């Protein structure tokens, strides 16, 4: 049975964790979905892991549409979420046009990075039938504003602001919240504060779901490994087995463990 946003809501209500993983092509989309992963994210992370850039900023709408269409052809029942790349949703009009392209390519949901300035955009998309995931915390498209890739929400003022933003974006129509590089206690507070399912990456084990970049969890990413990453291929004999092990570990809440978590 195909995973939908209602499936994720039911998981949250039952306290069952769900898994998400990036994919960028038809072959991996099939492998990931058949391994039991609930959500496939076509991330603008492709700019780094596929194209070799040092950020996600160079990724274009045409590239996101292309990879979304590839994933949609290979997918076997996972919910497909596509990133809207840098400045593709700077205005409501741009967001509507570009989200339509991704939905036509096969996405079931789009993901936007930002805070309360996105309320009008999320409301406009939601009213027109486009499900939205709001990405808070470390938002890679803002790397130049942050001065690097850093944990967000470490002081109480920033934490309270993030909780407020999550509630405001849910009220505007966000169906899903994604928290990246957020202290685990704050992620737990946000997960409890909103009715929408919350996906974490580097946000502890108390969120409703977990997401990783495919290349990271297979141990093939070069350079510095983020703290929240685990190499599942190192413990298995094949890529499909590694992906299935990841999905099972998320479901059992054995991943992320303490060593993958930011406490403060």
Swiss-Prot record:
Mg(2+) binds at residues 44, 83, 113. Its cofactor is Mg(2+). It is found in: Cytoplasm. Keywords: Cytoplasm, Magnesium, Metal-binding, Pantothenate biosynthesis, Transferase. The active site is at residue 180. Its EC number is 2.1.2.11. Pathway: Cofactor biosynthesis; (R)-pantothenate biosynthesis; (R)-pantoate from 3-methyl-2-oxobutanoate: step 1/2. Signal peptide: none annotated. SUPFAM superfamilies: Phosphoenolpyruvate/pyruvate domain (SSF51621). One of its GO terms (cellular component) is cytoplasm. It comes from the Bacteria. It catalyses: 3-methyl-2-oxobutanoate + (6R)-5,10-methylene-5,6,7,8-tetrahydrofolate + H2O = 2-dehydropantoate + (6S)-5,6,7,8-tetrahydrofolate. 3-methyl-2-oxobutanoate binds at residues 44-45, 83, 111. It is an enzyme of class 2 (transferase). Binds 1 Mg(2+) ion per subunit. Its main location: cytoplasm. InterPro entries: Pantoate_hydroxy_MeTrfase, Pyrv/PenolPyrv_kinase-like_dom, Pyrv_kinase-like_dom_sf. One of its GO terms (molecular function) is 3-methyl-2-oxobutanoate hydroxymethyltransferase activity. HAMAP family: PanB. Catalyzes the reversible reaction in which hydroxymethyl group from 5,10-methylenetetrahydrofolate is transferred onto alpha-ketoisovalerate to form ketopantoate. Homodecamer; pentamer of dimers. This is 3-methyl-2-oxobutanoate hydroxymethyltransferase. It comes from Marinobacter nauticus (strain ATCC 700491 / DSM 11845 / VT8). The lineage of its organism: Bacteria, Pseudomonadati, Pseudomonadota, Gammaproteobacteria, Pseudomonadales.
């Amino acid at each position: 049975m195909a995973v939908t946003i209602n499936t994720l809501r039911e998981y949250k209500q039952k306290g069952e964790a769900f898994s998400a993983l990036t994919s960028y092509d038809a072959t991996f989309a099939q492998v990931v979905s058949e391994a039991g992963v609930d959500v496939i994210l076509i991330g603008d992370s492709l700019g780094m892991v596929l194209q070799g850039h040092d950020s996600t900023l160079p990724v274009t709408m045409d590239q996101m549409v292309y990879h979304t269409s590839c994933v949609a052809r290979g997918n076997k029942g996972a919910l497909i979420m596509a990133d809207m790349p840098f400045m593709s949703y700077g205005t409501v009009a741009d967001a509507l046009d570009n989200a339509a392209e991704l939905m036509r390519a096969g996405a079931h949901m789009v993901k936007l990075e930002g805070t309360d300035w996105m309320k009008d955009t999320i409301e406009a998309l939601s009213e027109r039938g486009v499900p939205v995931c709001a990405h808070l915390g470390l938002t890679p498209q803002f790397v130049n504003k942050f001065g690097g890739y850093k944990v967000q929400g470490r002081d109480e003022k920033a934490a309270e602001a993030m909780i407020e933003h999550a509630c405001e974006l849910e009220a505007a129509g966000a169906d899903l919240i994604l928290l990246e590089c957020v202290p685990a206690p704050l992620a737990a507070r946000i997960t409890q504060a909103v009715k929408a399912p919350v996906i974490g990456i580097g946000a502890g084990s108390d969120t409703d779901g977990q997401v990783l970049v495919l290349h990271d969890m297979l141990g093939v990413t070069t350079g510095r490994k983020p703290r929240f990453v685990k190499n599942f291929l190192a413990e298995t004999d094949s890529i499909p087995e590694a992906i299935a092990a990841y999905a099972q570990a998320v479901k059992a809440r054995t991943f992320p463990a303490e060593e993958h978590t930011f406490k403060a």
